[in-house]
UniProtKB/Swiss-Prot annotation:
Protein name: 2-isopropylmalate synthase
GO biological process: L-leucine biosynthetic process
Gene that specifies this protein: leuA
Source organism (scientific name): Ectopseudomonas mendocina (strain ymp)
Keywords of the record: Amino-acid biosynthesis, Branched-chain amino acid biosynthesis, Cytoplasm, Leucine biosynthesis, Magnesium, Metal-binding, Transferase
Compartment list: Cytoplasm
Length: 556
């Protein structure tokens, strides 16, 4: 089957609402909306392998550290794992006093009751329920007319209100979503939401959240903004409701749709870090927040160490962040074009520390989000980096991790600039040796003893420094953690990988590590040895020595 020459035979254009007096195009976003992360619910349910309890807790703590005050933590009536996770959050005291958890439930009494069971003992919680209102869902999925759909929303609301009253020690919030709002007749969405408002009787001091999802993105963002503004004009008790938006990215405009919706009156935005979520994903909260930041608006979220946040998200979701993802991708602050690099260099030369940011091609100062400038001003091209990686793999069996490829390409570029010549594979390998494998000062690893018992590793390493022998001892859950515990400086391991070089009895292990010393910038190290543990230790000392040497050079 091929694409139709006349797609109008199969597809119909979106029918916009009439709003000739729209006001949103003249609005400016001058403050952050209320943010809600649905990474642990919408994001988690879209993963090939949903997160286990350990990953969910790690992700939750990351969201709290970033500054999220509302976090949708699961769908407890649909998953025992989610139910148990909600209980652990509450019983384990993991929820800060200024953070409110939210859970999702369908509009069914048995599921609502199970949801309230999961929330027993919570200080504050939002119960979020939904039912689909769009014509296609009414006709195809549920075989319900408009009256039936509205009755479901009202009945479920009454059940939620009754069960909440039975648990008065919890400070309750309520959220209703007319699912697939973007494809629903807007006047009918208002009718259903007004009926829900009558159930909950919200006040300006105790507002009801009305979440208007673009469950499937079906039109240009301006149409969604029109729907939001029209809804805000016609919904009852506007001063007693929070209009929330939840955009997906089916047409690739989820960020724009959310931003225009806020201009149109939305108070609150739901999304995921780096845009995870069903199909093409939810709107990316990182992009939205940093878009505000680069307009001089405090986003109320902290991405000062964006790579650490990205590491948690990638580990938990098992999905890499695209190299071109706004703000967070490996390549977003890198210019390969010579003319771009020239403009960036001139911009840095003229940029004053306390001046308005005006460096060409860079909408944000990379340092604000924990990035350094080396990748920005490197002169190596993409093909050059790819060639370096290819030669090392083909000639020496060395497969550098992605971020290390970028770091080492800068080393190669500096050498080619110095020599003014093309470097051979042997010369590139010699440079790799001198930069990483021979990095033995100020600390040279002479040997180590490792004892492992009941999942605990104890290590004793002998180190030569300034001609004198020292012994460092540490204990941890594995050899590397034990070694880090014994170091005289603070080391944070950002990434670690390993592979075999060769096969059979002559095989060696190659270990790669990315770490930070004393909170400094991330650097890499390599270790190669017949023994994997030794290779990993050599990699750590390689990176450690490089970091300390560079810090000493900068201080000088």
């Amino acid at each position: 089957m091929t694409m139709l020459k006349d797609p109008s035979q199969k597809y119909r254009p979106f029918t916009p609402i009439a709003l000739p007096d729209r006001t949103w195009p003249d609005k400016v976003i001058d403050r952050a909306p209320i943010w809600l992360s649905t990474d642990l619910r919408d994001g988690n349910q879209s993963l090939i392998e949903p997160m286990d309890a350990e990953k969910k807790m790690r992700f939750f703590k990351c969201l709290v550290a970033v500054g999220l005050k509302e976090i949708e933590v699961g769908f407890p009536s649909a998953s025992q794992t989610d139910f148990d996770f909600v209980r652990e959050l509450i019983e384990g005291g993991h929820i800060p006093d200024d953070v409110t958890i939210q859970v999702l439930t369908q509009a069914r009494d048995d599921l609502i009751e199970r949801t309230f069971e999961s929330l027993k003992g919570a200080k504050r919680a939002i119960v979020h329920y939904y039912n689909a209102c769009a014509p296609s869902f009414r006709k195809i999925v549920f075989n319900q007319d408009k009256a039936g759909v509205k009755a479901i929303a009202v009945a479920a609301g009454k059940t939620i209100k009754r069960l909440a009253a039975a648990q008065p020690d919890t400070q309750w919030g309520f959220e209703y979503s007319p699912e697939v709002f973007s494809s629903t007749e807007t006047d009918f969405a208002v009718e259903v939401c007004n009926a829900v408002i009558e159930v909950f009787q919200p006040t300006p001091a105790n507002k009801l959240i009305l979440n208007l999802p673009a469950t499937v993105e079906c039109a240009t963002p301006n149409n969604y903004a029109d729907q939001i503004e029209w809804f805000g004009r016609h919904v009852d008790r506007r001063d007693s409701v929070l209009i929330s938006v939840h955009t997906h990215n089916d047409r690739g405009t989820g960020v724009a749709a959310s931003e225009l919706a806020v201009m149109a009156g939305a108070d609150r935005v739901e999304g995921c870090l780096f845009g995870n979520g069903e199909r093409t994903g939810n709107v990316c909260l990182v992009t939205l927040a940093l878009n505000l930041y680069t307009q001089g608006v405090d986003p109320q979220l902290d991405f000062s160490d964006i790579d650490a946040v990205r590491k948690v998200v990638e580990d938990c979701n098992q999905i890499p962040v695209h190299p071109r993802h706004p703000y967070a991708g490996d390549l977003v602050h890198t210019a390969f074009s010579g003319s771009h690099q020239d403009a960036i260099r001139k911009g840095f030369a003229q940029q004053k520390d306390d001046a308005v940011w005006e460096v060409p091609y860079l909408p944000i100062d990379p340092a604000d989000i924990g990035r350094d400038y080396e990748a920005v001003i490197r002169v190596n091209s993409q093909s050059g980096k790819g060639g370096i990686t290819f030669l090392l793999e083909q000639e020496y069996g060395i497969s550098l991790p992605r971020r290390m490829q970028i770091e080492f390409s800068q080393v190669v570029q500096r050498e080619t600039d110095r020599l003014g010549l093309e470097m051979t594979a042997a010369q590139i390998y010699q440079l790799l040796e001198s930069e990483y494998l021979q990095a033995s000062a100020p600390y040279a690893l002479k040997g180590h003893r490792l004892q492992e018992e009941n999942g605990t590793s104890a290590v004793d390493v002998e180190v030569i420094s300034a001609g004198e022998s020292h012994h460092w001892r540490g204990i941890g859950k594995g050899p590397l953690e034990a070694l880090v515990a014994g170091l005289p400086v603070a080391v944070e391991i950002m990434d670690y990988s390993e592979h075999a070089i060769g096969a059979g009895t002559n095989a060696k292990a190659a270990a790669y590590i990315e770490l930070r010393v004393n909170g400094g910038r991330a650097l890499h190290g390599i270790g190669i040895d017949e023994n994997l543990t030794t290779a990993s230790f050599r990699a750590l000392f390689s990176a450690l020595n490089r970091a300390l040497s560079q810090a000493e050079s900068r201080a000088a």
